[in-house]
Structure formats: structure tokens, C-alpha cells
Amino acid sequence: MKMILFFSDLDSTLIYSGYPEHTCVEYNEAKEVTYMTAQGINFLKDLLVRKDFVFIPCTLRSYEQTARIDFLKNGNVPIIICDNGFSIYENGILDKTWDNLMKENLATYPTDEIKSDIEILVSSNNMCCKIKNNRNAFFTLIFENAESANMHYVTIAKVLKRHKYKLELQGRKIYIIPDFLDKVLAVKYLCKKFNPSLVITAGDSSVDKSFVEEGNQRIIPSHSSLNIRNTIITKKSGISAGEEILDIVMSLLKNQKLNIK
């Protein structure tokens, strides 16, 4: 049986922070983190029970952060792409073949040097932020708020421009990522492995652009700044766009079934 793969970013695509009037789908130490609409949750539940359909989250998050999300617990979603494509987990187990390939690519990058440069940069500029090392693959600077992250972005970019790293600003976080590392690499790897009949993709930010373009059917929320040709754009924005994306996926699956007949 041919599989249909749905690769989707999570934050600001399917799940959203700042919507306490909706259903919380993620807690961190009893604190509410992200939300979905009740209808969006129902759509996702309906999708996850299909035998011909595989939902594969594709996120900048670590595995530990991703595993906090309710619908990703208890084996409901067997495959997860984490760490901006650096890590693939299947049934909670790291894909060693993929991991070795990524580590080979990373070996040419001065991770210890850039880690030192980041620490010096933060200290010398009195930046009030937390430095997070993501499997030694990339680094995250977590500021108190988005304003602080914006204020320091240019300084960080100037200091780190000699390295083969790219910067991604998202809210109060600045991601410092090796230029080779892209979610699309993991997406292509899994598509080759499963040879799906249909690939659906969804994402909202610049780190999603390449993998969204890999889809036969591509969806982006209307609040996204992405500009991709031949893409379905939701009519709604914010958390309602997450619900609409899942509704669109269900419609695409229905049409796929009709076309097969």
C-alpha cells in the first residue's frame, strides 16, 4: 500500500502559543505552552488513525521539547524530524544511519570555535540570554523577549559572519545553524525510504521554505512571510490557520482517494 506523507512544522503552523482560550496541547513543568482549537485536535485525531497516512513533524525543537506535545505521546506519531533536520526519531529511537550522515557533514564545521565565540560575544556585550547547545549541531540564544533578540541580532550576525553558519530570528530566540543543515535533507531521506504516492508539506518560517517546496501539495498559513509558488494559503491566520491546514489535508486525502478510484 502506497503511503501519503504529511511533513509539517509545529510552532506557528499547527500549534500556537498565546491562545489560552483554546485547548492546551503542551505543558512544561505544569505551565501551559501551546494550544490548538478543539476542531483542529479532532481533525488531527481523524488523520492519525488512517492506515495510508503518516504525519511527520518537522521542527527546530529538540526531541525532548517535541515529546512534551500531547498528540506526539504514546506512539501516536512514529516518526519525528527534530533539530532542524539533524535528528530523525522512529518510535523514539534515533535513526543511526541518518545520524552518522549528519555527523559526517558537521565534522567539517568548527563547532568548538563557534561555541567559544558565542560565549565571548554574549559576555562582552552583556547580553541577557541563555545559550542552548542542540546536540552540538546548532546553537540557540534565548532572550527575555523578542525586543532584546531583535536588538542584538545585527551584532551577532557581524561577529559570526566569518563562520559557515546562518542565523534565524524567531521571537525571542536566535538560532545559529550550520549552512548545510536544512529540514529538507531529512524530508528527502524519508521520501526516498518510503516512496510515498503523495507528499503534503506545511510550514510558516524561512527554515521551512525548502522542505515545503518538496511537497506535491504545499500549505502555508496566511500569517507566514513565505512566498512559494503553487501553494495553498489558508484564509485564516493564527491558531485558526492551524485548524484550517488540517482541514485542507483531509480534503486533499479525500480527493486523492477519488482520483485513485
Q: What role is predicted for each listed range?
A:
Residues F7-P20, D83-G85, N91, N134, ...:
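Short loop/turn segments at strand-loop or loop-helix junctions that form parts
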Residues E119-E214:
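Conserved acidic, metal-coordinating active-site core of Asp-based
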Residues I177, V184-K261:
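Mg2+-dependent phosphoryl-transfer enzymes with acidic/Ser/Thr/Gly-rich catalytic loops
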Residues H22-E26, K73-G75, R218:
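Glycine-rich, phosphate-binding/catalytic loops in enzymes
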Residues K2-F6, L10-P57, T66-A67:
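Active-site neighborhood of HAD-like aspartate-dependent phosphohydrolases
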Residues S17-G18, T66-I69, N91-G92, S210-F211, ...:
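Short glycine-/acidic-enriched loop or helix-start segments at secondary-structure transitions
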Residues M36-S123:
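Active-site phosphate-binding/coordination module
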